[in-house]
A protein has these predicted regions:
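Alpha-helical solenoid scaffolds in large eukaryotic transport, assembly, and signaling factors
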Residues: 3, 11-347, 371-373
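Eukaryotic scaffolding regions of large macromolecular assemblies
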Residues: 337-513
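Intrinsically disordered, low-complexity mixed-charge
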Residues: 1-6, 513
Length: 513
């Protein structure tokens, strides 16, 4: 019958289809098993390649294989870092055995091998610097820094006087200076090496100066100088004597003879700082520099007069920057015997109407207390400062006035020649009568910029007597100390600084003994 099938035939067909399905399933299982069966452990493979290189020169081509693995840009490939670390060990071994050094009388075939190894070594450094250190993967950056510094150490072991310029170190410093400003690897370099070892500091100074002296375009120069500044500011300690130069990354003092000269050491730091400052800095960077100038920067300079232009430019910036600049100038005058005749003239010009209202008022008075501490200052000069502050206090906020009065008290104690400004009396009856009827012109010239020419010494402190009637009771009470006997040795200004108007009110009634 047409359309009907023999049972035997249909059974055979089903059997064949069943067998086909079985074979397909078996084949599929086989395919799934094959990767795991042939899978190679990356760590084991790299260890094998490394050990073969170290065992025999016949396997030097493994170096190229490891380089290709280290270059793999895949961030998920764990073999890249393993290969980079293995190569570091390989080249450390080759350096220690002088297998990358050409010698006189060496056979041409040997020279070819040495040259090939040098090229691979250079290629390896390029991978660490360009692909790892300047990349965006933090782990690779940190690994590259560690491996490059290991190479520096290994290279230094093979030479009596290690040439830092020809090794990876100068390229490493340049790469660190080219990183984005917020890159954490620069801080890691500073913490682990720059701040820890004298030889690293010394040669970083040289590398910074050399790099900044090259022809960099505008944006690159700004980036490099900003990173250089960040690096230099990380140094908080300045060696005071030869005995402070004790820590060496590359070995014994014998290998770092130039470092044993404190003069040479400081000279390199000075050159690095000058190269950085010449590139231009922002307002905030200038403030950062001035804030640590006396402790972290000026002590490096053998020729402190080279900082004068920087400080003068900083003074011209105005505001709190001017005050910080004068602080730096005062350090050079008092500690380094630098002559700066216009110092007090410049300081006097900062006493303007906004001073007692400014956010840096407390800092100003702290520094003023230092600047005016010498008892050898001319009475006419001291009188000008006292009188100008008295005039500014008339329009100042209570929180500012309560600093001015104790500061004046301390000035009178240090400079007794100015005290008659408080008790200037007219004894001639006729002159006294004229004053009472017509009043008098204050001889003090508020517009004069030279503190030696203001005639303040001929004036009196009527401003402070006026403040004794101030609306704020604490200000009025404090102002009265100028009219009383000076039995107190001095006031601690810190007790009156950093207070707002509300804080002055919270004091409650002020008792002045």
């Amino acid at each position: 019958m047409s359309g009907s099938k023999s049972p035997s035939l249909s059974g055979v067909k089903r059997k064949r289809e069943s067998n086909k399905a079985e074979r397909t399933q078996i084949k599929s299982k086989s395919r799934r098993k094959s990767p795991s069966a042939e899978e190679v452990d990356p760590q084991a493979e790299i260890q094998l390649l490394e050990s073969q290189v170290l065992e025999s020169r016949r396997h030097y081509n493994n170096i190229d294989t490891l380089l290709q693995k280290a270059k793999n840009p895949d961030p998920e490939d764990e073999a890249t870092i393993l290969a980079a670390v293995a190569l570091c060990r390989v080249f450390a071994r080759l350096l220690s055995t002088n297998d990358m050094v050409k010698s006189k009388g060496m056979a041409a075939s040997e020279a070819v091998i040495v040259q090939w190894l040098k090229e691979r070594y250079r290629e390896y450094q390029d991978v660490l610097l360009d692909q790892y250190l300047r990349g965006e993967i933090a782990l690779k950056q940190s690994v590259a820094l560690t491996l490059l510094m290991r190479l520096v150490k290994e290279e230094s072991k093979t030479e009596q006087e290690y040439n830092w310029n020809h090794g990876p170190f100068s390229r490493l410093v340049e790469s660190v200076l080219m990183l984005p400003e917020d890159d954490p690897i620069r801080e890691e370099f500073a913490e682990k090496y720059f701040k820890q070892f004298d030889d690293i500091r010394f040669h970083t100074f040289k590398a910074v100066k050399k790099f900044l002296d090259t022809d960099l375009d505008g944006e690159v120069e700004q980036l490099v100088s900003s990173n250089s500044l960040s690096l230099l500011l990380a140094l908080e300690h300045v060696p005071a004597s030869k005995d402070d130069i004790q820590s060496f990354f590359t070995g014994s003092k014998k290998q770092s003879k130039s470092l044993l000269s404190l003069k040479t050491y400081k000279s390199q730091a000075q050159e690095a700082w000058l190269a950085t400052l010449r590139c231009g800095i922002s307002k905030e960077q200038r403030k950062s520099i001035l804030g640590v100038f006396s402790n972290q920067i000026a002590p490096w300079f053998q020729q402190p007069e080279m900082l004068m232009d920087f400080l003068t430019d900083s003074y011209d910036a105005g505001g709190g920057t001017s005050l910080l600049a004068l602080s730096g100038l005062y350090y050079l005058m008092s500690e380094r015997n630098l002559d700066y005749p216009s110092f007090y003239h410049k300081l006097y010009t900062l006493l303007d109407d906004g001073l007692l209202h400014s956010k840096y008022r407390s800092r100003f008075f702290r520094l003023m207390d230092t600047f005016m501490s010498s008892t050898h200052l001319p009475a006419a000069l001291v009188a000008s400062f006292i009188k100008r502050f008295a005039r500014l206090a008339l329009h100042g906020p209570p929180a500012g006035i309560v600093v001015v009065v104790p500061w004046m008290y301390n000035m009178f104690k240090r400079h007794p020649a100015c005290t008659f400004m408080m008790h200037r009396e007219t004894r001639d009856p006729e002159a006294k009568k004229t004053l009472e009827e017509e009043g008098m012109d204050d001889p003090f010239n508020m517009d004069e910029q030279d503190p030696m020419l203001t005639d303040a010494i001929e004036s009196s402190l009527w401003e402070i007597e006026t403040l004794q009637s101030h609306y704020h009771p604490n200000v009025a009470t404090l102002a009265k100390i100028i009219s009383q006997q000076f039995t107190k040795r001095s006031y601690n200004l810190e007790d009156f600084l950093d207070h707002s108007y509300n804080a002055v009110c919270i004091f409650g009634p002020l008792q002045v003994s």
